[in-house]
A protein has these predicted regions:
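Interdomain "pre-motor" coupling segment immediately N-terminal to P-loop NTPase/helicase cores
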Residues: 11, 15-67
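Walker A/P-loop
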Residues: 105-129
Length: 206
């Protein structure tokens, strides 16, 4: 059978990763030394990796993370920043997501709270988790608008489905009782189902 017929059939199925691997096998004579199962596995694995990378790419687009270049490996552990390196590396393992634990990152302006939160978010996306980043003030505004147009229930459901929600700049301005109640409902809906990271200038006791 002509290989072009096979390629056309692969294209009809939209197996783009499979197609690239198939062409690679045709052009590289070293593949002739592999068994049928080994070559088939290579084709399937290429398609799997292609789909996985597409999901990661899509999750990055939907995450709204501003600094997609933020990575945990570039965190500067200067003494004055008082960062717990072992704790941060532990967070990088994503075990907190698997355990559905929440994180509070607090510190003064310029200490890198947002960078750290986004670096963790970027790592989570690369590990296959869905992530959403939003400033707390923006979320509160979305909640108010959803109350007005009747879409509040759908908004709560939307924020509940992300495996990791990053709420940046919590408490940067005073929050009313209603705002606090609405925010608590969002967080409580996610409790024991997924994880939330909150960055704030406020001490944890506040």
């Amino acid at each position: 059978m002509n290989s072009s017929i096979v390629i056309n059939k692969i294209l009809e199925l939209n197996y783009k990763g499979f197609k690239e691997a198939y062409i690679r096998q045709i052009e590289d004579i070293n593949y002739n030394q592999l068994s049928f199962d080994e070559r088939l596995y290579d084709l399937l694995d290429s398609e799997y990796l292609y789909l996985k990378n597409k999901r990661v790419e899509m999750n990055f687009k939907l995450s709204r993370i501003k600094d997609k270049q933020a990575v945990i490996e570039e965190i500067d552990y200067l003494p004055q920043r008082k960062l717990n390196k072992s704790l941060i590396l532990s967070l990088a393992s994503m075990n907190f997501l698997k355990a559905k634990q929440n994180i509070i990152i607090n510190g003064k302006t310029g200490t890198g709270k947002s960078f750290l939160a986004q670096a963790i978010g970027n790592r989570a996306i690369n590990e296959g988790f869905t992530v959403y980043y939003i400033r707390t003030s923006t979320l509160l505004e979305e909640i108010k608008l959803s109350r007005i147009d009747g879409s509040y229930t759908n908004l709560v459901k939307r924020f509940a489905r992300y495996k990791l929600l990053i709420l940046d700049d919590f408490g940067i301005s005073p929050i009313s009782v209603d705002d606090a109640t609405n925010l608590f409902e969002i967080i409580e809906t996610r409790n024991q189902l997924s994880s939330t990271i909150i960055t704030s200038q406020l001490p944890v006791k506040d």
